[in-house]
């Protein structure tokens, strides 16, 4: 994008990621789950009967797939690109099981590739209705294949391109699933997600919402560290200025994602009163931004697509966080995202405080995903509004 003409105004120099967990003194994922029987793990999660049944069915199917290799899979088509790799829909030839296979091409030593596959094996320990299921991983030449549960509704960034923006009630259900998924990863698997964004939130026609592409392999994270070529960043301000990754960083990314789902566009730079007025087809004086945030003194281009990558990163650090307009959204969701998007990590919400928030509790007991399931089914064959 910059072809050498843009300077890095932040002097970005992100700290290493692999050893951050081990330095914290926390148990590794393998240590955390190796000695706990599956039945006990599921009981501890407090799942509903439908959740337990669906998870058990997945594990039974998975039991029939002992190993994976290139010749065992038949590619059916491309599902999308994401985080350094292409994702294809595949069929396991022997069992007929449909999978999503992420293919990551890395020019690295064979020993490093094998170590990455070993680290990815921790995903076998993830048994949660809020985490996408894992079938296995293997290496073929310079390609690492990560085989996952197929979610027929695909990712929320794709859904968003089809419907424009999501109703608040569905964003409420998504919020519950994501917070519970992040909590499971942190408390049970002892890892942070590190890449929370709509494209890593998957949905299916059962109304389930699951996280994928989390940072279980430190070596894979490091191997892909120089491959960022995206036009968006969900990274928290403190990460862009060199601080270590914490759960607060995941919560910032989560909050930014929620705003995007609600307004239908990546919210950096933060929408102005004028843009919101156009979005909701009202006069500009009818737009009142939440949290008493006035028009920012920081004036970047209003269109995210026109921002160079380092302009965008500079805005995340120095510009105001996005805020939702009153009248068009409830006070509950406005307050919820505001708590996630505090610039200082020490002032940001925690996973525990989010679960006690009124917006979360409003949707926390909705076992019946029927309405959301119908919505997802209705989007599957829709064309994108802006292909």
Curated annotation (Swiss-Prot):
It is an enzyme of class 2 (transferase). Its EC number is 2.7.12.2. Residues 16-25 have a biased composition (Polar residues). It catalyses: L-seryl-[protein] + ATP = O-phospho-L-seryl-[protein] + ADP + H(+); L-threonyl-[protein] + ATP = O-phospho-L-threonyl-[protein] + ADP + H(+); L-tyrosyl-[protein] + ATP = O-phospho-L-tyrosyl-[protein] + ADP + H(+). Gene3D superfamilies: Phosphorylase Kinase, domain 1, Transferase(Phosphotransferase) domain 1. Residues 1-37 are annotated as: Disordered. The keyword Nucleotide-binding applies. Changing residue 217 to F: In n1989; severe constipation following M.nematophilium infection. Pfam families: Pkinase. It comes from the Eukaryota. GO terms for molecular function: ATP binding; MAP kinase kinase activity; protein serine kinase activity; protein serine/threonine kinase activity; protein serine/threonine/tyrosine kinase activity; protein tyrosine kinase activity; scaffold protein binding. The active site is at residue 195. Activated by tyrosine and threonine phosphorylation catalyzed by MAP kinase kinase kinases. Coiled coil: none annotated. Functions in the let-60 Ras signaling pathway; acts downstream of lin-45 raf kinase, but before the sur-1/mpk-1 gene product in controlling vulval cell differentiation. Required for progression of developing oocytes through the pachytene stage. Plays a role in responses to M.nematophilum-mediated bacterial infection by promoting tail swelling and preventing constipation. Involved in fluid homeostasis. Positively regulates lifespan upstream of mpk-1. Interacts with ksr-1. This is Dual specificity mitogen-activated protein kinase kinase mek-2. It comes from Caenorhabditis elegans.
């Amino acid at each position: 994008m910059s072809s050498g003409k843009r300077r890095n105004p932040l002097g970005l120099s992100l700290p290493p990621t692999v050893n951050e967990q081990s330095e914290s003194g926390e148990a590794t994922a393998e240590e955390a789950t190796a000695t706990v029987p599956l039945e006990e793990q599921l009981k501890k999660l407090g799942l509903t009967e439908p959740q337990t049944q669906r998870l058990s069915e997945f594990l039974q199917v998975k039991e029939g797939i002992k190993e994976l290799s290139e010749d065992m899979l038949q590619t059916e088509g491309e599902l999308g690109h994401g985080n350094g790799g292409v994702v294809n829909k595949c069929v396991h030839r022997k069992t007929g099981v449909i999978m999503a296979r992420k293919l990551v091409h890395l020019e690295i030593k064979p020993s490093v590739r094998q170590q990455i596959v070993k680290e990815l094996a921790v995903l076998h320990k993830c048994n949660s209705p809020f985490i996408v299921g894992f079938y296995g991983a293997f290496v073929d030449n310079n390609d690492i294949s990560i085989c996952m549960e197929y979610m027929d509704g695909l990712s929320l960034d794709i859904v968003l391109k089809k419907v424009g923006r999501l109703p608040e009630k569905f964003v409420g259900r998504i919020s519950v699933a994501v917070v519970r998924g992040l909590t499971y990863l942190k408390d049970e698997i002892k890892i942070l997600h590190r890449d929370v964004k709509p494209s890593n939130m998957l949905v299916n026609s059962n109304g389930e919402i699951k996280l994928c592409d989390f940072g279980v392999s430190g070596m894979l994270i490091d191997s892909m560290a120089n491959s960022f070529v995206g036009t968006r960043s969900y990274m928290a301000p403190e990460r862009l200025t060199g601080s270590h990754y914490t759960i607060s960083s995941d919560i910032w990314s989560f909050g930014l994602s929620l705003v995007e789902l609600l307004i239908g566009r990546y919210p950096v730079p933060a929408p102005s009163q004028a843009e919101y007025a156009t979005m909701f087809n009202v006069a500009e004086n009818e737009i009142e931004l939440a949290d008493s945030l006035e028009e920012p003194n920081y004036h970047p281009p209003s269109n995210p697509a026109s921002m160079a990558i380092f302009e965008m990163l500079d805005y995340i650090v120095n510009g105001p966080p996005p805020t939702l307009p009153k009248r068009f959204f409830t006070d509950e969701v406005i307050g919820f995202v505001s708590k996630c998007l505090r610039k200082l990590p020490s002032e940001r919400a925690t996973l525990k405080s989010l679960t006690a928030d009124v917006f979360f509790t409003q949707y926390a007991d909705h076992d019946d995903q029927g309405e959301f399931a119908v919505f997802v089914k209705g989007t599957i064959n829709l064309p994108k509004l802006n292909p």
